[in-house]
């Protein structure tokens, strides 16, 4: 399993495929698709997997008002293809929004802006098409950003998450569907 740039985005897998080197895990195309938040949102919509309303903006479009995209504050701003929540912000004010856009565009030429949905965060692992117990991820403060992902003691993870049987089955079903739709045929994690 590879983490981070070149590993999660399919570049290492593509290189191995070209060189005929066997590896475990998902192939290059599915890895690349899964890292692109704009494309995954399109796949999710096409297959009835819930995803927040949002828009993908290219550099130069950041000055257009949120209302022109059917969005209003608060919103989540994130680089299109990044990982580990690098460059991800929850913007509650116009000032926070403009700063978030500036920072997100410093990572990539495309940014995803989504409606902010307040709630709990969960992670569902899928191996060979079967979902595993759900993990609830609760940051001690703020949201599950880069700092909270990698600083010891900054999050509380509960497994299995305290959820009704109905919600558990629903979330696991969506994670299995995501793995199927994106071709993540070995193992994956859906948040």
Residues covered by each model-derived region:
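Conserved N-proximal alpha/beta basic substrate-recognition cap immediately N-terminal to
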Residues: 1-53
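Glycine-rich phosphate/pyrophosphate-binding beta-alpha loops
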Residues: 4, 85, 140
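A short, local hydrophobic-aromatic micro-motif
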Residues: 24, 52-53, 132, 144, ...
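Active-site nucleotide/adenylate-binding loops and adjacent lid/helix of ATP-dependent enzymes
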Residues: 32-120, 172-173
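Phosphate-binding site of ATP-dependent enzymes
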Residues: 92-173, 178
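A short glycine-rich, hydrophobically flanked beta-strand micro-motif that places a catalytic Asp/Glu
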Residues: 111, 115, 185-191
């Amino acid at each position: 399993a590879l983490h981070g740039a070149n590993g999660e985005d399919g570049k290492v897998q593509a290189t191995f495929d070209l060189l005929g080197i066997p590896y475990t895990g998902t192939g290059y195309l599915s890895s690349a698709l899964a890292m692109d938040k704009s494309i995954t949102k399109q796949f999710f919509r096409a297959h009835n997997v819930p995803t927040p309303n949002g828009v993908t903006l290219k550099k130069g479009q950041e000055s257009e008002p949120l209302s022109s995209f059917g969005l209003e504050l608060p919103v989540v701003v994130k680089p299109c293809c990044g990982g580990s929540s690098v460059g991800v912000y929850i913007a509650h004010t116009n000032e926070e929004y403009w700063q978030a856009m500036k920072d997100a565009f410093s990572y990539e030429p495309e940014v995803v802006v989504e409606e902010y949905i307040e709630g709990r965060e969960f992670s569902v692992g899928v191996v060979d098409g079967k979902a595993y117990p759900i993990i609830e991820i609760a940051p001690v403060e703020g949201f599950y950003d880069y700092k909270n992902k990698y600083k010891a003691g900054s999050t509380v993870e509960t497994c299995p998450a305290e959820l009704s049987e109905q919600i558990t089955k629903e979330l696991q079903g969506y994670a299995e569907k995501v793995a199927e739709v994106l071709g993540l045929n070995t193992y994956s994690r859906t948040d």
